[in-house]
Amino acid sequence: MGTTKVTTPLIFAISIATIGSFQFGYNTGVINAPEAIIKDFLNYTLEERSETPPSSVLLTSLWSLSVAIFSVGGMIGSFSVGLFVNRFGRRNSMLIVNLLAIAGGCLMGFCKIAESVEMLILGRLIIGLFCGLCTGFVPMYIGEISPTALRGAFGTLNQLGIVIGILVAQIFGLKVILGTEDLWPLLLGFTILPAIIQCAALPFCPESPRFLLINRKEEEKAKEILQRLWGTEDVAQDIQEMKDESMRMSQEKQVTVLELFRAPNYRQPIIISIMLQLSQQLSGINAVFYYSTGIFKDAGVQEPVYATIGAGVVNTIFTVVSVFLVERAGRRTLHLIGLGGMAFCSILMTISLLLKDNYSWMSFICIGAILVFVAFFEIGPGPIPWFIVAELFGQGPRPAAMAVAGCSNWTSNFLVGLLFPSATFYLGAYVFIVFTVFLVIFWVFTFFKVPETRGRTFEEITRAFEGQVQTGTRGEKGPIMEMNSIQPTKDTNA
């Protein structure tokens, strides 16, 4: 158990799975660059249809709907994760939902030719559904096929796929590439290509061995896949751990979303999962990128859009750094460092934004704070919330937990997007103080409540939470900090 061998089949399976993460990142960032061009399309199409120019209110509302409907689709999709993975399996679910990506991409890609605003909005809704499902499927699949000793590092690749997707969308959105009046439908429709690639490659990836053994009782097939993925014949301990979990599952009733909040042994991990997802979206990362172009412009950067892409490069670099740190430092430690660093940078950004009109050099301080803020985000709050949810739950409750956590992430993302412009209007630069307060709250919560899962099997983590519940029923203090000090499973293959 806990092999650290990295095999070609394992890397291939994880790489193909993270195409779904890339799709999420790409479709999150792709709508920003061609904003003015798409508004012109909306204006022209509506004017042709009604023979009168649309009001500015209608135009703004339709643009806002085109952006926000993606998050609405994501909320619905993320909450539907369990319906797919329990019925079709992890790999087959990823394969099936690519039909949504192709359908959404076609609608957006052909909306200009058809002169249809409805096709654009419907395409964004469908692609949101697809991305919402991917945010559940990908971390779950990666977590279940990865060796315990490498689960965190490989789990971080989900976030790497997301940030690469955002970066590619920013680059493709440049006016010299696809961000033009003629080519913007190709920019939106590009999502079809990764979907086709993933459809072609997924049949060569194995199904999750945990799903095969625990859900389907196919022990020999699961054993064969584990041996091929991990490059070792000695998987007896892992198979036994899965069989033990399978036996426990057969004695329990099916775990629903409501059961996650009702059952004492699930309540604490689901609250931790939700809080970690909120710590990602309420950290202010989207606000920083919203402000960045204007700040770079004020600092005298000739092409602020390229500076924003530079911030995206920093985003990507530090996600790679996190891949190598997460199994050394641990999830909890990196999350605390990330939240603390972001809180400091958030205060620094507030001060520099308030003083930059009086002191020109303050703009450069603000740029530095932005880049460091982004770096701290990708060390902790960026990657960790996505994959730690899969670690906190056993096979039975995991799909429902991923659905709840994913839905809370998408919902908070939607609310931040909805409320942030108004907050900025009333608070100005002080809006970052609000995010600082959130960051401090999440830091305190993480310090006292979030356990370290590095090097521990799913069974060990689940039993640790059950131990807290049993201890708590005897009127004693729950050993959440003891859980942080449990030694990882020793590598018997080393």
From Swiss-Prot:
D-glucose binds at residues 159, 280-281, 286, 315, 378, 386. It catalyses: D-glucose(out) = D-glucose(in); D-galactose(in) = D-galactose(out). It is found in: Cell membrane; Perikaryon; Cell projection. Deoxyglucose transport is inhibited by D-glucose, D-galactose and maltose. Galactose transport is inhibited by D-glucose and maltose. GO terms for molecular function: D-glucose binding; D-glucose transmembrane transporter activity; galactose transmembrane transporter activity. Residues 33-64, 112-118, 175-183, 291-304, 353-363, 421-429 are extracellular. One of its GO terms (cellular component) is membrane. Glycans are attached at residue 43. The modification Phosphoserine is found at residue 485. The keyword Transport applies. Residues 1-10, 86-90, 143-153, 205-269, 326-331, 390-399, 451-494 are cytoplasmic. The chain crosses the membrane at residues 11-32, 65-85, 91-111, 119-142, 154-174, 184-204, 270-290, 305-325, 332-352, 364-389, 400-420, 430-450. Belongs to the major facilitator superfamily. Sugar transporter (TC 2.A.1.1) family. Glucose transporter subfamily. PANTHER family: SOLUTE CARRIER FAMILY 2, SOLUTE CARRIER FAMILY 2, FACILITATED GLUCOSE TRANSPORTER MEMBER 3. Interacts with SMIM43; the interaction may promote SLC2A3-mediated glucose transport to meet the energy needs of mesendoderm differentiation. This is Solute carrier family 2, facilitated glucose transporter member 3.
